[in-house]
Amino acid sequence: MENTVQPSTGQTTSPTQSDRQWAAGAHAGALALALLTSWAAGIAGAVAAFVVWMVVRDKSAFAAEHAREALNFNVSMFIYAAIAVMLVIFTLGIGIIVALPVWIVLGLMWLVCSLIATFKAYDGHMYRYPLTIRLFK
C-alpha cells in the first residue's frame, strides 16, 4: 500500500478504506456510466468522475486526486474521439480509414486503463493515465 504525506503535519498516512472505495468508485463509475451510455459519447464517463470529485474533494485528497485523474482521462478520450469524427467529416468520409483504427485503439486503451486505475485505487496506489490532458487541476 502506498503511503501519502500530509502537507500540514508532514506525517505519512495510508488512505482509509473509505478513501480507497471512493477513489476506485470514481474510475469504476466513469467506466460503468460510459459503457451504459455508449463509450463513443465519452463524456458520460466524465460526469461520474466529476460527481465523485465534487463529493470528496474537501474530504479526501487521495480520492479527490483519483476522481480528478478519471475526469481528465475521460474528457481527454472524448476530445481524441471528437477529433477523429472531425477528420471523417472534413475529409468527406475518407478519414474513416484513419479514424476507425484510432477509435478501436482509444476504446481498448480506455477500457484497460480504467480497469487498471480502479484496481490500483482500491489497493491504495496512485495511477496516472497515459495520454491525458490535465484540464482540471
Question: What are these model-predicted stretches?
Answer:
Residues 23-47, 72-114:
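Hydrophobic alpha-helical transmembrane segments in multi-pass membrane proteins
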Residues 32, 54-55:
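Hydrophobic aliphatic residues
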Residues 1-21, 132-137:
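Low-complexity, intrinsically disordered extramembrane tails and loops of integral membrane proteins
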Residues 19, 61-65, 96:
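Membrane-helix interfacial "entry" motifs
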Residues 55-80, 119-129:
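Amphipathic, cytosolic membrane-interfacial segments at TM-TM junctions
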Residues 2, 112-137:
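Juxtamembrane transition segments at transmembrane-helix termini in multipass membrane proteins
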Residues 53-54, 115:
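Membrane-embedded alpha-helical segments of multi-pass transporters/permeases
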